């Protein structure tokens, strides 16, 4: 595990968890930032000593449980994870661990002759198997045998709440939990080779012990389908994707699992339509692109031609890694570029299509364009694009596993994530920043149509969109749409469609709903950004985040690039299938 992040020590985490926010703010005002950083690094060094101690305990674990350290597999005791032993694998993903834990428990139960059925639990990121209380002893023995194949952890739960520390299956504490737990959280711990990405019981297979009551088997906690079943209810076999929104429904076949008919039916909240992703990307370091850009006059505002807007820091590589890790249900990725391809891109991957600007602009006179508003106005013209899709810039990242329901309702409505930031109130002026000018133009059009004055901007998080609504907007506002699509650089007459106008228009016409997302916005030019990146890496608690650079004057590019590369490679160490294998490691 990396030891360079001062925000990642257990002591700093405990301080933030236990000390009220108001008191922490008072401390921050009184203690200089430099001194706080020194103290955090000191705590981190103490954490390294703790890591050495835990590695020594890992050596003792090797002697105590030699069967856990098989030839050809690397295992390590990892700090910050309760001294758990993690299986180190070249490829680690939340869905992969979820499936592996389900396979592990299903195999153990079937080999022991224990009847079970899968249940639709309240979390899409874990699997759940129900067994009869009368089979508890057999289940315990099966899990002990299961531990012979690798480090398997158990954790007793009441409802969704853990009631004990994780314990190795087969250990004294593990046996105790298996004898008494109403719900037994079961699974392995996986780590990538760098130790930066560690996944554990958040992707477990939970074993529920259902008790007999009035001739029925009764669940020990709520689930999404039923409180009880008949012991004789017929079993059916369904794909795992039927039981969770996190599975890759439209991209690959998932294993099947045994369940009861009540759990096999589609539920009203299930999103069953395909969802694509669209990226727009430019390599501002490309000499040919720079020559094309310099042949035309710049934008009206310094920010519209700010070089920082076009700097490529390899964000796309890591945004795709984030997508593959945290949204395996995405059907297809469309990468919109100006005839460019990253050298590392595996553009022959069947789930990736590179789309040139010329394929979506009907009027050749509009090209070349260096205006993101113009490019975004043509996204719905991508051939083969699904009706429902997410639009991302390469500075947007999924920070933890998400489901389709985080962005869409099952009836097709899109979720809108409003920002606390506001569209400035004065009328448009040449001094407006491009984003503010477009927001004001959006406001004027929406006021004319719907009689409401929009105030809030949108979070710079993945935008949930519908192709048909974008087509409707082009028909509804033909002049503004045409003018935006033909503005070679950002212009004071632009409208911003997928990042703002769409969401209000869809809301006013009953096709979008305001929603929340755990989100963080970071600007590389801000002095506190290194600390915030460290906190984000230590916690990994945001569903999405954006790392932007709108304020940089270009003098600090090298330092920012190094800082961002260190952060992204630690947050997303596992290459995606969209990278060429021979150049995937970085």
Curated annotation (Swiss-Prot):
UniProt entry tagged with the keyword Oxidoreductase:
no
Enzyme class per UniProt? transferase
Question: A Pfam family in this protein?
Answer: Stealth_CR1
Carries keyword Chaperone? no
- Gene Ontology terms: biological process: polysaccharide biosynthetic process
A molecular function (GO) held by this record is:
transferase activity, transferring phosphorus-containing groups
Record EC number: 2.7.-.-
Q: Which UniProt keywords apply?
A: Exopolysaccharide synthesis, Transferase
Regarding protein family, the annotation reads:
Belongs to the stealth family.
**Miscellaneous section:** Stealth proteins are part of a protein family that is conserved from bacteria to higher eukaryotes. Family members were first identified in microbes as proteins that help pathogens to elude the host innate immune system. Microbial stealth proteins are involved in the biosynthesis of exopolysaccharides. Stealth proteins are predicted to function as hexose-1-phosphoryltransferases.
Tell me the PANTHER family matching this sequence: N-ACETYLGLUCOSAMINE-1-PHOSPHOTRANSFERASE SUBUNITS ALPHA_BETA, PTHR24045
UniProt name for this protein: Exopolysaccharide phosphotransferase SCO6023
């Amino acid at each position: 595990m990396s030891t360079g992040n001062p925000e990642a020590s257990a002591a700093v985490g405990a301080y933030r968890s236990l000390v009220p926010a108001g008191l922490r703010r008072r401390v921050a005002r009184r203690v200089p930032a430099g001194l706080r950083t020194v103290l955090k690094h000191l705590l981190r060094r103490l954490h390294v000593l703790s890591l050495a101690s835990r590695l020594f305990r890992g050596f003792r674990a090797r002697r105590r449980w030699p069967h856990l350290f098989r030839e050809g597999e690397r295992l390590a005791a990892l700090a910050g994870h309760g001294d758990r032993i993690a299986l180190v694998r070249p490829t680690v993903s939340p869905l992969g661990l979820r499936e592996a834990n389900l396979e592990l428990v299903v195999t153990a139960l079937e080999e022991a002759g224990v009847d079970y059925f899968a249940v639709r639990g309240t979390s899409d990121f874990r699997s759940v198997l129900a067994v009869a209380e009368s089979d508890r002893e057999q289940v315990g023995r099966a899990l002990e045998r299961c531990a012979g194949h690798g480090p398997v952890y158990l954790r007793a739960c009441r409802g969704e709440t853990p009631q004990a520390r994780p314990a190795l299956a087969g250990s004294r504490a593990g046996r105790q939990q298996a004898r008494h737990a109403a719900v037994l959280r079961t699974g392995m711990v996986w780590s990538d080779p760098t130790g930066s990405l560690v996944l554990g019981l958040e992707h477990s297979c939970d074993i529920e012990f259902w008790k007999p009551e009035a001739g029925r088997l009764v669940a020990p906690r709520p689930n999404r389908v039923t409180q009880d079943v008949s012991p004789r209810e017929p079993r059916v076999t369904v794909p795992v994707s039927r039981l969770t929104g996190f599975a890759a429904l439209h991209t690959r076949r998932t294993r099947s699992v045994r369940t009861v008919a009540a759990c096999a039916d589609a539920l009203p909240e299930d999103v069953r339509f395909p969802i694509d992703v669209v990226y727009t990307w430019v390599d501002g370091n490309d000499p040919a692109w720079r020559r094309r850009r310099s042949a035309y006059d710049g934008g009206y505002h310094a920010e519209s031609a700010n070089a920082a807007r076009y700097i490529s820091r390899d964000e796309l590589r890591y945004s795709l890694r984030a997508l593959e890790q945290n949204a395996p249900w995405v059907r297809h990725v469309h990468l919109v570029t100006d005839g460019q391809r990253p050298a590392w891109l595996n553009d022959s991957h069947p789930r990736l299509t590179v789309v040139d600007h010329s394929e979506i602009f009907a009027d050749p006179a509009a090209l070349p364009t260096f205006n993101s508003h113009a490019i975004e106005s043509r996204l719905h013209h991508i051939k083969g694009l699904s009706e429902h899709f997410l639009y991302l810039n390469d500075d947007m990242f999924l920070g933890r596993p998400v489901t389709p329901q985080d962005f869409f309702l099952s009836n097709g409505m899109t979720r809108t994530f409003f920002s606390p930031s506001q569209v400035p109130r004065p009328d448009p002026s040449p001094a407006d920043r491009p984003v503010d000018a477009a927001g004001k133009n959006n406001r004027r059009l929406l006021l004319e149509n719907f009689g409401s004055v929009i105030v809030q901007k949108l979070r710079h998080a993945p935008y949930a969109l519908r192709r048909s609504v974008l087509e409707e907007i082009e028909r509804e506002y033909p002049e503004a749409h045409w003018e935006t699509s033909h503005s070679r650089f950002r212009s004071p007459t632009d409208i911003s469609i997928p990042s703002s106008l769409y969401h209000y228009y869809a809301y006013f016409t009953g096709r979008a709903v305001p929603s929340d997302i755990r989100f963080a916005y970071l600007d590389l030019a801000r002095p506190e950004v290194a600390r915030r990146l460290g906190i984000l890496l230590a916690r990994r608690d945001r569903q999405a985040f954006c790392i932007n650079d709108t304020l940089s004057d270009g003098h600090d590019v090298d330092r920012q690039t190094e800082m961002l590369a260190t952060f992204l490679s630690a947050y997303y160490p596992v290459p995606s299938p969209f990278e060429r294998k021979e150049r995937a490691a970085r």
